[in-house]
Amino acid sequence: MFRGAQAINLDTKGRIAIPTRYRPELLAENQGQLICTVDIRQPCLLLYPLKEWEIIEQKLCQLANFDPAQRSVQRVMSGYATECELDSAGRILLSAPLRQRAKLEKTIMLVGQLNKFEIWSETEWQAQIERDLELGLSGELATSDALKMLSL
């Protein structure tokens, strides 16, 4: 499981170093294979261990090609999906189209989301966290049935 948010430098070749604490799990369970794609709702990237991506891929295959909204989700998620492999230094290369889509610059945020990571520009991450906290304080989150059942 991937938890926490960490600032990481993006090198001039477009690589990021995956934090050391995650590498053993990624190597043991996925041989260092990851898939990076865009988030269709947020200005960030989604980084999946290969086994997790294969679950998503099956769900994408089940969407209806003749439904425009479902086809759009398939097109974007699959079209941007890029294989990434941990190198010997624990780095992955983020393709130029992915970096441009998420507006990634020198410092990025790698955010654990339990079964995957989100990759944000530092600026976008700070703005999103502020919006999320404001939403929580406003009480609007309590309108979700799933969240009403969540006990923390």
Curated annotation (Swiss-Prot):
Keywords of the record, alphabetical order, are: Cytoplasm, DNA-binding, Repeat, Transcription, Transcription regulation
Residue ranges of domain SpoVT-AbrB in the record: 5-52, 81-124
Q: Which Gene3D superfamilies match?
A: Transcriptional regulator MraZ domain
One MF annotation (Gene Ontology) recorded for this entry: transcription cis-regulatory region binding
Question: What processes in GO biological process is this protein linked to?
Answer: negative regulation of DNA-templated transcription initiation
| UniProt keyword annotation of Nuclease present | no
Matching entries from NCBIfam families are given as: division/cell wall cluster transcriptional repressor MraZ
> What is the name attached to this protein's record?
Transcriptional regulator MraZ
Record the organism: Mannheimia succiniciproducens (strain KCTC 0769BP / MBEL55E)
Q: Which gene encodes it?
A: mraZ
